[in-house]
Amino acid sequence: MKDDFIMFPKVDFAFKEIMRNETVRKGFLSAVLRIKDTDIKSVVILNTNLPKVHSDEKQGILDVRLTMNDNTEIDIEMQVCSMKTWAERSVFYVSKMISEQTHINKMYSNMKKCINISILNFNFTDKTKRFNTTYHICEDTEHFKYTDIAEWHVVELPKLPEVSDGTDIYDWAKFIKSEKREDFEMLAKKNNYLKEAYNQLDIISQDEQKRLEYTARQKALYDYNELMHENYTSGYEKGVAEGKAEGISEGVLKEKTRLAKELLKMKSMTLESIAKCTGLSVEELNALTLA
């Protein structure tokens, strides 16, 4: 019997399962890249097997690698855990996608365009309030493209406004961010691509084996977030404690120095007596007399 359980698309396991559907891939890319769906002739998924062990699994990264129209390679990454070096990481992977082509194509003119699409469940930049941004390699002054070989698209889910801006990418971001079946049903009425995405999500949500894998993945991401939070909290508390101790130590030293200076001015006590009284060494007292 069908229950009301529904997976969250922002959990990368669920997102990747949805992307196995070619119709969904076509609709998603049309929205993100802002191109006509009729211009997308084919979208072939390259890494068809979801890895059991992934080099970035602890950081919550699973990607979908595609080739579009046989002339463009696309890497879609869903990142649920905050990462300060995301820009550098995405540049590295696009560079890797480009360099991998040299093993096949010896002519630079034959290299495919490489695109990274990052769907982030954290704020990537504070330089703009827009939830969707696009980046190229451009000339500094007039901003024309140096090359069209590389391109980056970033979708920041936390920045998604409540009111739609009327774009297809807004509807897709809303779909990925949603957690309630009624929200998915509403979005499915927007267009056939989102309808297909919801149908696919519903199918995998009722698959017992996929549900087990989804739950395991969700737990792994939760555990990672908890570990990062604990490390941050313990590090912060340790820093505060060390700061307090250092502050107290500096305060005591300043008071000893002040007292020593007063006693030295009086010239009624020997250096040895002042040293015993203040806890400073004779050498330190001599330094004060020369200061």
What is each model feature region?
Residues 1-211:
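Conserved single-residue anchors adjacent to enzymatic active/cofactor-binding motifs
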Residues 2-5, 9, 74-79, 174-291:
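Short, charged alpha-helical interaction segments and adjacent helix-coil junctions
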